[in-house]
Each structure stands twice: as C-alpha cells, then as structure tokens.
C-alpha cells in the first residue's frame, strides 16, 4: 500500500492583530477589541480560546521582530513558513510610521536623548509609547545602515529594507533631515506637516545634493553639494547692482500688471522680497544658515506675502516671472546656478504657502 503524506505548517498570521500589536496595544486590549467586534460569535469560541489565540499571535510577532529588523533575513529564515506576499506585508507595516510622530522628531538627532523624550511625544500625539519607540528605532536603524553607503539614498533604502517606493522616499526625508539637522521645531514652523517637509526634502535631494550631479559619486546623496552652495554667493549681484535690481523689477512688473490682485503690494515690496531670496541663497555656505533654511523662508518671504493677502495663484505667477525674467538680463552671468536655486525654492515656497 502506497501512502502520500503532505505536511503543511504555514504560519497563520492575523493582519488585524498584527496592526494592533504594531500600534502598541496589550493582549488584553486586543482580546477586548476582538470580543467587541463579535469574533466569539463568528468563530463559536470561548473567551479563553480567544485569549490563547491572541497570545499565540503576539508571540509569533515578537519572534518575527528580530528578523524584521534585518528584512533581507525574512525570506531566508526557516523558522516560519510565510508566503512571500505576507512577508512583504509584514516588512512594510513594521516600517510604516505615523506622520504626526515623524513630524515631532524630524530634524532632531536620532540619539538616546531624543529617545528619552518619547514619553512627551507619545502624550502629545496620542500614539502608544511602545509604537513611538518602534518607529524611532526604525528611523535610527535605517539612518545607521544607509549612512555608510554610497549612491542614491532612496534606492539604498529600498534595497536594504525592501520597502515600497513611497515609504522609502519618506525614510529618505527622515535621513536627510537627521543628517542636515534642519530647524523644524520653531513655533512659526508648526503649521507645516511632515508631508510638506517630505516634499521639500525630495526637491533638495533631487537638485541640490552631490548625487543630483553625479550618481556615481563616492558620497551618499544626502549631503548638499558644497561647490553649488559656494557658487550661490554670485547671485548677490542681482540685488547689490542697482541697475540689475531695477531692470529685474521692471521686467517682472511688466509681466504681472493686470494679472494679480496684489500688484501694488508686490511692486512696493519687490526689492525686499528679492533681497530676501538672494540673501538666503548667499548664506547657505554656513551650516547654521542651511539649518535655518525653512524658518528663513517663512519669516523673510512667506510671512510678508501672507500679510499682504497674496493668494497661492498670485505667488505662483510672481515666482514664475521672477525666476524666468532673469534670463533676459544681459549683464547677469549666473543663469545655471540661478535656475538650480530658484527651481527648488519656488517649489518649496509654493508647498509651504498655506494656513
């Protein structure tokens, strides 16, 4: 007599319980939530069975956690039989983070000191302390791994942590801000969300870093290109040379007359606004001024426009003509640097210009 025997030991994972575990809930919390959701009736199970099942799930997740901290090990381990699509789900969800949590630690040093403050972050955001710690440790882990790598930041994060493109880009923001230590905590910047900063980080990484110029560069592309920052000083001529400043103003006013409601306010404040943008550029050779980029944009450009009741449409038209009209100034010789600077600044200001 021949007998074929098939043994299956696929690990059964409940995605809903996994999410609750990630969110920092206790076993008793999860049991209560499952009972409230009618699981006992649905499965015709007793509370003891439900408790036992929840404990088993938690134990499985805790055993998986060590593997999830080095995602490439998940596919090669033999302890759990987990289908590849579920492996991807486990990794992605483990590394997902709450944007309100990320906003609180953005730009801070990923150190023990910051980790000690997570009690306050938890109280402020309503996110469980356990979840805050997991998210913070993930930020720190990704930063430490990619800090030593050469080449494109987003690709390095994807390759080593097997994350989706969107999530890898969000982590690139965390790494970029931790590396450059941009000021994000001042009161005047509190209206800006993590998504606002993530957009700006993407612009800076794409156009101002060493990797933006040469993706075979030895360094990681989170470092702003020093030669570019040094060359920004040449833009000062645009506001220091009275003839150039007057010509620039005349060109922009000629283009915008009758097209924006705040024309008179724009005409009156043109020189101050232009000086603000050019002075921000010329000071970026200093580490402190790089850190203050966002607060400078808010205080020296966004707030004056806001107080004069500019709409987003007014601002977009102004920045477009302000940027492009420079190309017709024959005495101005720094068009390439200007375009590289203003392309990013325009995008960031438009993203940051909201209540």
UniProtKB/Swiss-Prot annotation:
Transmembrane segments: none annotated. Keywords: Membrane, Nucleus. It is a peripheral membrane protein. GO terms for cellular component: endomembrane system; membrane; nucleus. It comes from the Eukaryota. One of its GO terms (biological process) is determination of left/right symmetry. GO terms for molecular function: fibroblast growth factor binding. Disruption phenotype: Morpholino knockdown of the protein causes severe deficits in laterality. Partial loss of Kupffer's vesicle cilia with the length of the remaining cilia reduced. Double morpholino knockdown of IER2 and FIBPB causes an almost complete loss of Kupffer's vesicle cilia. It is found in: Nucleus; Endomembrane system. Mediates with IER2 FGF-signaling in Kupffer's vesicle ciliogenesis and in the establishment of laterality in the embryo. May be involved in mitogenic function of FGF1. Interacts with IER2. This is Acidic fibroblast growth factor intracellular-binding protein B. It comes from Danio rerio (Zebrafish).
């Amino acid at each position: 007599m021949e007998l074929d025997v098939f043994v299956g030991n696929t690990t059964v994972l409940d995605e809903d319980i996994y999410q609750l575990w990630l969110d920092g809930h206790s076993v008793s919390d999860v049991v209560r939530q499952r009972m409230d959701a009618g699981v006992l009736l649905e499965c015709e199970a007793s509370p003891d069975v439900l408790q036992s099942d929840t404990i088993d799930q938690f134990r499985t997740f805790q055993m998986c956690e060590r593997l999830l901290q080095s995602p490439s090990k998940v596919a090669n381990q033999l302890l759990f039989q987990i289908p590849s699509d579920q492996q991807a789900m486990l990794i992605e969800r483990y590394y997902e983070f709450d944007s309100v949590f990320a906003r609180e630690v953005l730009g801070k040093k990923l150190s023990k000191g910051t980790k000690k403050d997570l009690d306050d972050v938890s109280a402020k955001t309503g996110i469980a302390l356990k979840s805050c710690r997991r998210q913070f440790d993930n930020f720190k882990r990704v930063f430490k791994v990619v800090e030593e790598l050469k080449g494109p930041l987003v690709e390095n994060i994807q390759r080593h942590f097997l994350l989706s493109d969107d999530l890898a880009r969000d982590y690139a923001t965390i790494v970029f801000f931790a590396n450059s230590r941009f000021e994000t905590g001042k009161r005047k910047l509190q209206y800006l969300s993590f998504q606002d900063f993530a957009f700006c980080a993407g612009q800076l990484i794409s156009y101002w870093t060493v990797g933006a110029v040469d993706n075979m560069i030895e360094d990681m592309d989170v470092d702003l290109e020093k030669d570019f920052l040094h060359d920004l000083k040449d833009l000062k001529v645009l506001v220091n040379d009275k003839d150039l400043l007057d010509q620039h103003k005349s060109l922009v006013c000629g283009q915008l007359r009758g097209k924006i409601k705040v024309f008179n306010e724009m005409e009156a404040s043109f020189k101050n606004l232009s000086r603000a943008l050019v002075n921000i550029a010329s000071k970026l050779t200093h580490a402190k001024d790089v850190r203050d980029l966002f607060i400078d944009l808010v205080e020296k450009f966004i707030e004056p426009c806001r107080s004069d009741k500019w709409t987003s449409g007014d601002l977009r038209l102004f920045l477009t003509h302000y940027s492009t009209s420079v190309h017709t100034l024959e005495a101005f010789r720094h068009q390439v640097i200007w375009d590289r600077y203003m392309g990013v600044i325009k995008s960031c200001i438009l993203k940051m210009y909201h209540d």
